[in-house]
Amino acid sequence: MKNLIANKYATLSLISIMLTAIISASHHVFRDGLGQIVLFLIIILLPYVLIRWFTHTGTKWAVALYGLYNILIIAGLGVVDGFLDHTLKALGFQHTTILPGGEAEVVKTVFSLWSPAAGNSFYEGTGILTFIGSVFATVYLFQFVRTLHQRTEKTAKEQVHGPGEAGA
């Protein structure tokens, strides 16, 4: 990936989606325990693998899979869990998802901090941070894909007109 702007947005997109996945993983491991740790390691590392695949091969399949992965994380973890279950609850709105435990004032967790209030604050806070991270991931994914699309159009025009030729 030689385009510096695309590289910048690819890096920002990768950082934001990986941080969102890390926050969401800590959120769910805190609640459910270490049983899902392998799944979350895959979820955290997959975007890095896809971006590396793209930088080495330039294939559109890597970008398509990376975009699909981002959409699934943003929609599933960011919007449904982070926004509908935790952010709206923190803002005082009623429970709006079908997620288990979402209607509870205090969700039972496997791990605990120094007090139940601190544990609940950590759990709800990481849910809200998952939503915030997904907002950044959405913006940077859009910028990354848009930059790649503009680069592709520019390259196609150069191929049609050739270097140094005046375009019609």
Model-derived segments and spans:
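Membrane-helix interface and helix-disruption motif detector
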Residues: H28-V38, L88, A117-G125
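Juxtamembrane non-transmembrane "cap" segments at the membrane-aqueous interface
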Residues: V80-V106
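Cytosolic juxtamembrane helix at the C-terminal end of the final transmembrane segment
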Residues: A137-G162
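Transmembrane alpha-helical insertion/packing segments
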Residues: M1-L45
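Helical transmembrane-bundle signal
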Residues: I17-S24, N70-G78, T130-F144
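Canonical alpha-helical transmembrane segments
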Residues: I44-Y66
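Transmembrane alpha-helical segments of multi-pass membrane proteins
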Residues: L14-M18, A64-V80, G162-A168
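Hydrophobic alpha-helical transmembrane segments
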Residues: A104-V139
